[in-house]
Curated annotation (Swiss-Prot):
This is Peroxisomal 2,4-dienoyl-CoA reductase [(3E)-enoyl-CoA-producing]. SUPFAM superfamilies: NAD(P)-binding Rossmann-fold domains. A motif (Microbody targeting signal) lies at residues 298-300. NADP(+) binds at residues 42-47, 67-71, 93, 189, 215-221. Its main location: other. Substrate binds at residues 67, 95, 125, 133-135, 226.
Length: 300
């Protein structure tokens, strides 16, 4: 049974779990993305799942690509059942270009086009730099940064170069001021922000727009759980955020929808920060973050 959506203080509906909403209020025309196709990495859960749902509720068919075929196949069934649009699950590893080539070929064979690319696949965890292994740092860079470039390049070469399109990268604000315990993810996301600008310049003449959404703390996500969101909420840390709360997944999906659609037709090379103002005011509390890491280690 679907979880009851939350609608508080005019916030958009959302559910904490990786389930579709049983009610959705459109803020754009329901046919905004009519008959377009979106390719979404990491689309089987969290923000990626909600992005897929919201795009599909605006007339878009989707491809959700991830390493876990069983998980994304279940997600695809939910998305199609709720929205009535097609959703193709494809097993793919963003670190392996040959799997991306095969996935894009299957997408073009099935749908005949790709209009939107959402680079959402990512990996993150809290870890002091002194405890971070060489392999752990490398893995995050490979998934977040190399994965974004690999997927963007394949889709550009196979479709966007001749037909145009919109790329939206999912980033973070970690690198804006040097977030404690996040040298791996902060470095990867900073590289992605630079990549957004470079590709916007190079691919603009082909009719390709490249933009980024940088979320803050978003409830109902694996990142929220891994990065101490519940602990921060309990400790009252969100009071330092200008909007006094965490965001929800639908709010992030709406930011992506704006950048992916013709609503932002003259926007490229931009980073849209969707964090309630958190990075402007939140304390970079090293002791609190280290406390979260220590408490988790003690439970293992």
């Amino acid at each position: 049974m679907a979880e009851k959506p939350q609608l508080v203080n005019n916030l958009p509906e959302d559910v904490e779990t990786d389930e579709c909403m049983n009610k959705y209020t459109h803020i754009y025309s329901p046919d905004l993305l009519s008959d377009q196709v979106a390719f979404i990495t990491g689309g089987g859960s969290g923000i990626g799942f909600r992005i897929a749902e919201v795009l599909m509720r605006h007339g878009c068919d989707t491809v959700i690509a991830s390493r876990n075929l069983e998980k994304i196949s279940q997600a695809a069934k939910k998305l199609t059942s709720t929205t009535g649009r097609r959703c193709l699950p494809i097993a793919m590893d963003v670190r392996q270009p040959e799997t991306i080539l095969a996935a894009v070929d299957e997408t073009l064979k099935t749908f005949g086009r790709v209009d939107i690319l959402i680079n959402n696949a990512a990996g993150n965890f809290l870890c002091p730099a002194t405890s971070l292994s060489f392999n752990a740092f490398k893995t995050v860079m490979e998934i977040d940064t190399m994965g974004t470039f690999n997927t963007s390049k394949v889709i550009y070469d196979k479709w966007f170069k001749d037909h145009g399109g919109s790329i939206v990268n999912i980033s973070a604000t970690l690198g804006y001021r040097g977030q404690a315990l996040q040298v791996h993810a902060g470095s990867a996301k900073a590289a992605n922000d630079a990549m957004t600008r470079h590709l916007a310049v190079e691919w603009g003449p082909s009719g390709v727009r490249v933009n980024t959404v940088a979320p803050g703390p978003i409830s109902g996500t694996e990142g929220y759980r891994r990065l101490g969101g519940s602990h921060a909420e309990t400790a009252g840390a969100f009071h330092s955020i200008p909007l006094q709360r965490a965001g929800n997944k639908t709010e992030m999906a709406h930011a992506v929808l704006f950048l992916a659609s013709r609503a932002s037709s003259y926007v490229t090379g931009s980073v849209l920060v969707a964090d309630g103002g958190a990075w402007l005011t939140s304390a970079n509390d090293v002791e609190r973050l280290l406390g979260i890491v220590s408490s988790r280690s003690a439970k293992l």
